[in-house]
Amino acid sequence: MSYSCGLPSLSCRTSCSSRPCVPPSCHGCTLPGACNIPANVSNCNWFCEGSFNGSEKETMQFLNDRLASYLEKVRQLERDNAELENLIRERSQQQEPLVCASYQSYFKTIEELQQKILCSKSENARLVVQIDNAKLASDDFRTKYETELSLRQLVESDINGLRRILDELTLCRSDLEAQVESLKEELLCLKQNHEQEVNTLRCQLGDRLNVEVDAAPTVDLNQVLNETRSQYEALVETNRREVEQWFATQTEELNKQVVSSSEQLQSYQAEIIELRRTVNALEIELQAQHNLRDSLENTLTESEARYSSQLSQVQRLITNVESQLAEIRSDLERQNQEYQVLLDVRARLECEINTYRSLLESEDCKLPSNPCATTNACDKSTGPCISNPCGLRARCGPCNTFGY
């Protein structure tokens, strides 16, 4: 791009007339891509004497091109920055309410699940306590059952012993009855023998009554026999009474023992029936407690499985949300880094613009206000000066580009 400058032609001094005013190296360059631009143009000490030489025109043209490209790049970067800011703003406006709403719902769901888990834990603890109480009650019932079973066995053994005693007493009673019968038969036999002997003696005495003997008074045999008979009868009666009394006493005692044994047997049978009923009721209750424990354990297992599945689902949701948050954070960090890079580029461009501006200002200040005072300053190789160098000079294109 060529600029038509209204400035008069300028030429360098004799010390720099044979070479362009460009430093041998770009050590003064501080901006990227500007190494071909002189960092300090004032080293050439150039002033207006007539017209620019070729190298100075090329340098100014190059500076104007670079400045225009940098300004265009700054505008493009500003547009890109504005687009990125709008995109970030739209993205944040689009995602912020959704994320907040989803987080609130997740927090509410998590709180509800935590409350349910706490309720389940308390219910589980209560069920465990009930199971422990049921186990203790079942152990107590088992102990009572074993105690009652041992008592039942003892009572049955006592009943068997009493039955054996009753059998022995029955045998003894039958023996005593047999003895009484035998004594009665013996008594009848004795009576019959006595009658036979009496009759025999009477017959013998009846045959001897005709004999008369003068002797001492004889003994009355009938009286003796009667006395003997009365004595035997009294003895037999006494023995019979004693035997009957002994038999009655033994029978009464045996009856009392049988009655007491039967009463005890009935009471024991009633106790056994009651114990059987109690044992059956305890067995039924124990079976019910076992069924209740099994049902509670199944319910607990199902609840744990259900809540574990719900908790895993919530964990997956939380993981997805955290991954989305991580992606959003990474996107924000990346955009922030890009924004910082753009800000750095903008700052460097502004610094470069300020540097070019200061260079141009310094070069404008170094231009002499009356170059005709030094008429011998022109070199022969650069051509003669303009006849009227002190005329008014207008700003060139690059100066207008900076806004002066």
Swiss-Prot record:
Domain (IF rod) spans: 56-367
Q: Which GO terms describe its molecular function?
A: structural molecule activity
Q: Where is this region: Tail?
A: 364-404
Gene Ontology BP terms:
epithelial cell differentiation; intermediate filament organization
Q: Which SMART domains match?
A: Filament (SM01391)
Q: Which GO terms describe its cellular component?
A: cytoskeleton; cytosol; extracellular space; intermediate filament
The answer to whether keyword Coiled coil applies is yes
Similarity comment: family membership:
Belongs to the intermediate filament family.
Q: What else is known?
A: There are two types of hair/microfibrillar keratin, I (acidic) and II (neutral to basic).
Alphabetized PANTHER family for the sequence? INTERMEDIATE FILAMENT (PTHR23239), KERATIN, TYPE I CUTICULAR HA3-I (PTHR23239:SF98)
Protein name (Swiss-Prot/TrEMBL) = Keratin, type I cuticular Ha3-I
* Protein's organism: Homo sapiens (Human)
| Gene giving rise to this polypeptide | KRT33A
